[in-house]
Amino acid sequence: MKCTVTAKESGLVNADILVQFFSKKEMKRDAGKVLAGLGVVASPDGDFKASAGEIAMLYRQASGKEASRVILAGVGEGKTAEDYRKAADSVARKTVDLHLGVLALDCSPIDDWAKQSKQKPEELAAILVEGVLSGAYRFDRLKSGKLDKEETKEDKPKNIEELVLAGCGSRLEAIEKGAGKGMIIGACQNRARDLVNLPGNHLSAEDLAEAAIEAGKRGGFEVTVFDKKKIVELGMGGLLAVNKGSEQPPTFVILDYKPKGKAKKTIALVGKGVTFDSGGISLKPAQGMDEMKSDMSGAAVVIAAIEAAASLGLPLRVVGLVPATDNMPGGSAQKPGDVITTMSGITVEVGNTDAEGRLILADALFYAKKEYNPDVIIDLATLTGACIVALGNSVAGLFSNDEKLAESIFEAGQSSGEKVWRLPLWDEYDELIKSDVADVHNTGGRGAGTITAAKFLEKFIDGHKHWAHIDIAGPAFWAKGGSKTPGATGFGVRLLLDLLKGWS
């Protein structure tokens, strides 16, 4: 998608659809005057309340290539960044559904929006562009089109070809800068969604490594891939144990972005890369197993966030670590009751082979501390269904041994719209993962499942004082039938970038 920023009045821009944003207050006060000035031939009905993400379609008398369709987009109270992101997302969905290619947003009131939301115009421009890219996203690369009926081919959604931010006036330079950032962040988040949406037969651990290499080429940072031989040499027993039932080899990917100047901090991001999770010998139920292609969401988010950080030129060193494999049953697969030795030397009793993510993360967390000793370690993983039970599908679980880090991640969640909620890491939970035959057990029984998983991971950070674990099992992937686009969400990319920008 091309993005154009112009000082030209929005009503004079060549476009298929023109968007006017209104808060609830502005809808009552200004809508009549604004719409009359555009030549809109009818007013919205009383059902349109300008709630955040609510839209209404109107028409106007237009000449030439000016937009005849006008969308009213509600931003609710207009007090948060998320109000504007929701509105832009809804507008993009509607534009794609109408098979229209050029979308124009009226940005002339951006100073008022900035005052209401306490955001800078540059930040709001980025948010609007991110929202449009998110709403316009479609995953259809695996469709051949051969079964489409001739008469329905014209009805296939067409993605937005150009986004125009119009009426920018004296804020042109700031909006251009913000739009550029929004294009980077939105594109990287959508690449993460592409990876997560790929089924297991299209995305192996080696394919995921190749995607990281391509991200490195685009972002200009170094990517190193360890093959199975190197993983064996390093003694990554957790990753190797999970991979035992697979015919596909594992990989361990290192992404290393270094800024041009001196880095203010070194941040390690660890992403779970289980490309398909059958549960292994502890086989999952058939219903919903197809969605387990999304069990590498943490890896996709880490790859995308580092590419975005590099493209934005953030003054931080950001190291990404991605242990990758699928988790399959088979004659050589690990079994419940097995005892494995991880890279750290800590032995683990495997009570359930479907608690595999923590095994591969154990090696990656230890490697991060041992090789880089970073200022901060953050891991992201679709780790536990228990987190969904606790927090639902919209919020991620947050665990940290550092109060200040936890607070920073929470605030980044609020600003990015990718919200997290902190859960405890109290010592009492250690009792639940004790083993009679090994140093630690990989499951903790029925209760507090998301907490015991985090407590397990904590044992592999080798005493690091600034670590956080984010369980994204709920918000990483949306099932069909919801109000959002089904499939991968890319949850975590904006969260990490807001956090990294805060440290910049």
From Swiss-Prot:
User: Where, by residue number, does Mn(2+) 2 bind?
Assistant: K272, D277, D295, E356
Q: Which InterPro entries match?
A: Leucine_aapep/pepB (IPR011356), Macro_dom-like (IPR043472), Peptidase_M17_C (IPR000819), Peptidase_M17_leu_NH2_pept (IPR023042), Peptidase_M17_N (IPR008283)
CDD domains found in the cross-reference section:
Peptidase_M17 (cd00433)
Pfam families membership = Peptidase_M17 (PF00883), Peptidase_M17_N (PF02789)
* Record keyword Metal-binding present: yes
Give the required cofactors: Mn(2+)
Positions of the catalytic residues: K284, R358
As to how many cofactors bind and how, the note says: Binds 2 manganese ions per subunit.
Question: Domain of life of the organism in this record?
Answer: Bacteria
Which reaction(s) are listed as its catalytic activity? Release of an N-terminal amino acid, Xaa-|-Yaa-, in which Xaa is preferably Leu, but may be other amino acids including Pro although not Arg or Lys, and Yaa may be Pro. Amino acid amides and methyl esters are also readily hydrolyzed, but rates on arylamides are exceedingly low; Release of an N-terminal amino acid, preferentially leucine, but not glutamic or aspartic acids
- The answer to whether UniProt assigns keyword Heme to this entry is no
Molecular function in Gene Ontology: manganese ion binding; metalloaminopeptidase activity
**What's a GO biological-process term for it?**
proteolysis
Q: What EC number(s) does its UniProt record assign?
A: 3.4.11.1, 3.4.11.10
Task: Tell me where it resides.
Answer: Cytoplasm
Q: What is its main location?
A: cytoplasm
Q: Which SUPFAM superfamilies does its entry note? A: Macro domain-like, Zn-dependent exopeptidases
Summary of the function given for this chain in its UniProt record: Presumably involved in the processing and regular turnover of intracellular proteins. Catalyzes the removal of unsubstituted N-terminal amino acids from various peptides.
**Protein name according to UniProt:** Probable cytosol aminopeptidase
Supply the gene name: pepA
